[in-house]
Structure formats: C-alpha cells, structure tokens
C-alpha cells in the first residue's frame, strides 16, 4: 500500500525540525499551528528587532515559494522580498529562507493588520517581550481577524464590526421515524458597540434542502452582515454545505467551517458548546449572573439551546483572539420575529428588496 503523502505541516514538523532551536524554526512551528487552526488564509507577523516580518522558503528545484500565503501577502502589501541567506531543511532539501516586513511602529502595525484582515486573513502577531544578550523571547500579542478588528472610521465601525457564529444542525428523522428537521442557532456580536444578538429557529419538512428553508437565516445574515463567521454544521456532503451558504446569502471575507461530525481543530469546542455545564461556565465567566438557572428561564435561553451553543462558542472564540473585546459586551437579546411578510426571500430579491448571494 503506497505511503500517504505528508502535508506541509507534517513535513515541517519532522524530528529534525523539532530539534532546530533557531528563531526561524520557532516561526515555522508556530505558523503551522495557526494555519491548522484557522485555515490557509493565515499570516503570522513576527517581531525581529525593529521590524515585523513574515518568512517563507523557496524550493531549490522549482524556484517556487512553498508557502502560498507569502505570495498573497506580497500582492496585498507590495513589499520587497529579501533573501535572509540562511537555510531551512524541508522535505530533505536545504531551502533558502526569504522574508518581507516593515518597521516596528504602532502606526505601521495597525496599517498592515487592517490591510491583511480586510483581505480576509487571520493575523497572529508575536512580539519581543524580553531580551537576554542575543536571545529574545517572544509571545503572542493578539490574533486579529476580519470580525475582531476595529475599523478606523467610527461611522463605518458601527455597521461593519460584526462577527457571528452560525450553528446549522440537521436531522434526517430516520432514528425516530419523524420528519427531517434543521436547527438554526446564531449569535452576532458588534465589537464596537458590544451589542450581542441571538437567533434560534427550527424547520421541519420533507424537502429540507430547499432555499425557502433558509429564509430566516438569510434575513438575519443580511441585517447584520458579519465580516467574519464561524459556521458550525454536521453536513457530510460538502456540496450541500455550499448550497446552504448560497441559500443563506452568506458572502463575507472570512468563514471558519467547523464540521462537528468530523475530527478537526474546533470540533471538541463545538461539541462542548452543547454541554450544559460548559455553557454555565462560559456564561458565568463573561457575565455577572448570580442565579444562572433563573437567568436561563427569564432570558428564554433554556428554550433556545442552539442559539446558546453559538453564543458560548463565539464568546470563547473572541476571547482567544482579543480578551478586551469580551469585557464590555452586553447581555444577549433575541432577534426572533413572529410577524414577517410571507414572501420568500428569493422573491424579495427579484423585487430588489433584499440583496443576497443569488444576485451577485
């Protein structure tokens, strides 16, 4: 049986790489962790003295950069590429290390982080906090992403600084011999105002994979238009998942897909977010709730479990990126509306009343 081809991360994490104690090896090891967690559209900015830098390696045989995000970084920033004149072993080859970067000033760091997040990237930033001789210790400053970064313009920021978690969970009804159903649970946070809006909805019907089923999700998404979405689901068919994105009119710069039916970086966290003990821990961590059971009943969160799931996941996700954003968030309110015009959203789109992915 042929050997399974290793990924870039696996190859770079071989024993020889782990024993490499140079700064450049630490950079690649940390970068791999972030790419595995947040996806390929991740760029690690790394302080090196008076500069912030990003590194890549070039294949000596093909003359190609082996880390695709480096090419996109250059396209976005138009920065010069420099040869560091050091080698890094990759896949048995001695590869040259290249870099690009900018001066370490708050102004330039904010400028380029905004450029990168506007381009749909997640941007971990590591800085030097201690120096002993030539040895410099670094640690994470913050993780920036499209939904966790303030826009510079105040008027723009009130409308655009939304980050959301959508949980879409389906049941085919075969176990209980019931009608197939879809559960929707959404949480949207405006990181500028601290307003937190929830939405919970259930649909039961035989033809469950139908654009009309997603009308309420499309309405919620079009109102808040988040810049970043964590999309939790249990679809096995990736084609159906992409249909859901289209049906819902979701078109944002950064989507994190979390399939809780398959092993992945956020799978355990997504499943934990359904755990009642975990939910209580999360809610009491971020809010001063003296009587949690009473709060659940008064807020009706006990009747809307998937919205609570999305809320808990979102709070933890944002706190991991920037804990300051969770310090002044408001208690959540629900967006569920009982009275809507009974006209499907695709029909409204034809009347130019709503703007969705169908019209793009």
Regions found by a protein language model. Give the residues of each.
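Basic, polar low-complexity surface loops/patches
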Residues: 2-360
């Amino acid at each position: 049986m042929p050997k399974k081809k290793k990924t870039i991360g696996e190859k770079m994490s071989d024993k020889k790489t782990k024993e490499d104690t140079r700064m450049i090896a630490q950079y690649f090891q940390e970068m791999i962790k972030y790419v595995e967690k947040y996806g390929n559209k991740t760029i690690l900015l790394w302080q090196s003295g008076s500069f912030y830098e990003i590194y890549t390696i070039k294949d000596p045989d093909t003359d190609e950069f082996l880390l695709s995000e480096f090419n996109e970084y250059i396209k976005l920033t138009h920065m010069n590429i420099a040869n560091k004149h050091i080698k890094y072993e990759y896949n048995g080859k001695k590869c040259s290390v290249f870099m690009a970067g900018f001066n370490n000033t708050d102004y330039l760091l904010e400028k380029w982080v905004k450029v990168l997040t506007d381009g749909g990237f997640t941007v971990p930033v590591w800085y030097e906090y201690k120096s002993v001789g030539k040895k410099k210790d670094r640690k994470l400053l913050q993780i920036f992403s499209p939904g966790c970064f303030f826009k510079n313009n105040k008027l723009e920021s009130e409308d655009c600084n939304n980050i959301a978690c959508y949980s879409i969970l389906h049941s085919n009804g075969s176990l209980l011999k019931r009608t197939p159903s879809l559960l929707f649970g959404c949480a949207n946070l405006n990181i500028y105002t601290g307003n937190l809006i929830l939405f919970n909805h259930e649909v039961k019907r035989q033809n469950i994979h139908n654009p009309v089923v997603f009308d309420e999700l499309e309405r919620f998404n079009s109102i808040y238009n988040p810049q970043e979405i964590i999309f939790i689901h249990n679809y096995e068919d990736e084609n159906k998942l992409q249909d859901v994105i289209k049906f819902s009119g979701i078109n944002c710069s950064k989507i994190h897909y979390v399939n809780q039916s398959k092993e992945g970086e956020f799978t355990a966290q997504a499943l934990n977010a359904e755990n009642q003990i975990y939910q209580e821990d999360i809610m009491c961590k971020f809010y001063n709730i003296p009587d949690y059971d009473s709060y659940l009943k008064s807020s009706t969160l006990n009747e809307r479990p998937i919205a609570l799931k999305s809320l808990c996941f979102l709070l933890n996700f944002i706190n991991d990126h920037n804990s300051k954003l969770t310090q002044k968030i408001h208690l959540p309110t629900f967006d569920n509306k009982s009275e809507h015009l009974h006209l499907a959203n695709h029909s409204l789109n034809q009347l130019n009343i709503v703007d969705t992915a169908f019209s793009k």
